Amino acid sequence: MSIRQTLAVALAAMALSASSAFADEAAIRTVGDGVCRIDKIGKIAEEGVFVDYTLSPEAGSEIRCRIELPSAERWTGELWGIGSSSQGGFIGNLTAYSSGGHAVATTDLGTYRYEKGDLRGKPWPDAVFKDYSWRATHLMTVYAKRFIKAQYGKRERRSYFVGGSCGGRQGFCEAMRFPEDYDGILAYIPASMMVAANAQVVNLYRQTHDETGKALFTTNQLACLADAPIAYMKDRDVKPYAGSVLSNPFFPEAEIDGLLAFVARQDPSLSDPELQKRMKGIFMGARDAKGRVICHGMLPGAHHGNPGGMSFRSKGLCAASVLRNGVSYSAYPSWEEFEEKAVARGGEINASSLDLSAFAKRGGKLVVSCGWEDQTTPAPEIIAWYEYLAERNGGFGKTQEFCRLFPLPGLAHGGGKGRIATSGGSVKEVHRNALRQWVEKGIAPETYPLAWPAKNLTLPIPPYPLQCYLGDDGKWKTRRYPKCMVRRPDLRYYEMAPL
């Protein structure tokens, strides 16, 4: 063989090696159609491939997605869908999953132009509202499975979804609207009960502002109100929580009265009768003219902000978190306005159905967590949803066969600072493995480990309605949360609009 021939063979071998990740590029491109535009195909580590694709199911819809596909030799057979956060508009980093051998997909929920791009701050048109509410995640998944079939020549063995806040809502929506998409879903601090959570924000704003929109409390006063419950309960709470966090922040009315008297002693400026009335309203929530519960009220100890304290929460956030369609609240939103603007449209973005029968029937499993210090997606609305779900499905025992809820003490939302943990910082591979064990082997998670670094502890959180505590003998024990501790919002706030 001549030198020229030898060189040609070597170059051909190098080219083949360099393009091995693209061996099925032609097959991948066959997935493109009138809805799916393939924007880019490229390499990831260890001979893997990424595909950037945009979905446009109707005019005005532009859903950006990415899937990362490990090499056939490394693929675990699993697809993981990854949730977004806030209002979406970005593609998150998927390396942690694809490097572990999983096919993994995510989406910007179709909101990039309105959240990060040339239309930033503009009202969402109906097509984008629909994408964000339910369509983007489903279509991302449909096409992700097509890319998997094209790349590997076979379907995924199992499909899982994980997400928190907005991503948790995505997971709920998948289980409720598209139960065939995923076998197991891990939804932490889900922003799912959007209308009910929006009511909490409206109530907090109304209690902390006058009718002109003027703030009635200082930041220091609200910080005192957020921190006082820990000191108030330190001699009566159970181990290991006493003096650090609340084991159970669902205070009955008499306990709230005692707390407010304690707050007045802590900060005499909060002894004013009008401020006392408003602080009680923060915790006791609101009812309509017929006596129906609009919202439970914020939990004592709810944290938001760094280093901590209860925030004012703006009426602007009310509209942004639920509507994002040009609707805005007045300076002092009334409950009539809430009904008109949030309830009327909120069913489209709610992910709070009490019918998970199709998901459960096909063997789907849903693991949910919520945080006692979460002021952004308040725990009472999630607990209320789960209690309604249990009543609809024959009790907690039956419901726990397909859906388990784990309330986490000391957990705050992203952007805040929880006394034990914040947002997804508490979600580890151990939780994903627990979901996998439940789906594939039928071994349901009996605990949700919550790391408490400050005390060098890991709390073995049991599924609701149980809670864990340390006995005097130093061993973990469980007890049931009190019945009827939640002032459950009216069921109509949990309704989902049909597609």
Predicted segments, located by residue:
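Bacterial N-terminal signal peptides
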Residues: A8-A18
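Catalytic-loop region of hydrolases
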Residues: F22-E78, F90-G92, D227, M233-V327, ...
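N-terminal cap/lid subdomain of alpha/beta-hydrolase-fold enzymes
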Residues: S56-V128, R135-H138, S165, Q207-H209, ...
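Cap/lid segment of the alpha/beta-hydrolase catalytic domain
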Residues: T76, S86-G153, A199, S328-K341, ...
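Alpha/beta-hydrolase fold nucleophile elbow
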Residues: K154-S165
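Short glycine-enriched nucleophile-adjacent loop
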Residues: G168-P179
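Active-site nucleophile loop of the alpha/beta-hydrolase fold
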Residues: L186-V195, P407-A412
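Short beta-strand/loop motif that positions the catalytic acidic residue
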Residues: V368-C370
